[in-house]
């Protein structure tokens, strides 16, 4: 898997914080997010899932994620936005890779990316959330093209 190290800017995000098994909460969170975006006529810059925990360490029922859209820096949360959070993904150095997700198996490209990145001689994984952006509408296309972001720091 090819990847590159990039400096990313801080992203302001709005959406839903979810807790539980990612195979359920991410789908549920994006359903809620789509409803809110449509109802509020939000024009998202990006659709993003943010992952806070290591599923090899944290029990599935305690896994945390955010299903969000990136918004302009001057974004103000509209009325009738119950349950919506506004927060940020911090800027910094990230390893990034693009992958295609088929059969809804989002774990496979992430596992491959982590395995490859752990072999990097110059960078190590930093203690911060990972995230993915969606490059297409997988509900329409039957597959998802995603860009994965893992925070890194020099060894």
Swiss-Prot record:
Keyword Cytoplasm among UniProt keywords: yes
Membrane spanning stretches: none
Any GO MF annotation of the entry: DNA topoisomerase type II (double strand cut, ATP-hydrolyzing) inhibitor activity
SUPFAM superfamilies in the record: Probable bacterial effector-binding domain
Keyword entries, A-Z: Cytoplasm, Stress response
Family (UniProt): Belongs to the DNA gyrase inhibitor family.
UniProt-annotated location(s): Cytoplasm
Record keyword Transmembrane present: no
Subunit structure: Interacts with DNA gyrase.
One Pfam family this sequence matches: GyrI-like
One Gene Ontology cellular component annotation held by this UniProt entry: cytoplasm
Protein name: DNA gyrase inhibitor
Gene for this chain: sbmC
NCBIfam families recorded: PRK10016.1
Record-linked InterPro entries: AraC_E-bd, DNA_gyrase_inhibitor, DNA_gyrase_inhibitor_GyrI, GyrI-like, Reg_factor_effector_dom_sf
Origin organism lineage: Bacteria, Pseudomonadati, Pseudomonadota, Gammaproteobacteria, Enterobacterales
Biological role stated in the UniProt entry: Inhibits the supercoiling activity of DNA gyrase. Acts by inhibiting DNA gyrase at an early step, prior to (or at the step of) binding of DNA by the gyrase. It protects cells against toxins that target DNA gyrase, by inhibiting activity of these toxins and reducing the formation of lethal double-strand breaks in the cell.
């Amino acid at each position: 898997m090819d990847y590159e190290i990039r400096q990313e800017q801080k992203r302001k995000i709005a959406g839903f914080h979810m807790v539980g098994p990612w195979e359920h909460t991410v789908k549920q969170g994006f359903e809620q997010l789509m409803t809110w975006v449509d109802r509020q006529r939000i024009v998202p810059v990006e659709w993003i899932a943010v992952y806070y925990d290591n599923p090899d360490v944290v029990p599935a029922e305690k896994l945390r994620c955010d299903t969000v859209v990136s918004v302009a820096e001057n974004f103000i949360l509209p009325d009738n936005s119950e349950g919506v959070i506004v927060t940020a993904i911090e800027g910094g150095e990230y390893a990034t890779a693009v992958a295609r997700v088929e059969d809804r198996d989002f774990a496979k490209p992430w596992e491959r990316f982590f395995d490859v990145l752990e072999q990097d001689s110059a960078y190590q994984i930093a203690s911060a959330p990972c995230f993915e952006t969606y490059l297409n509408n997988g509900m329409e296309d039957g597959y998802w093209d995603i860009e994965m972001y893992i925070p890194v720091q020099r060894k």
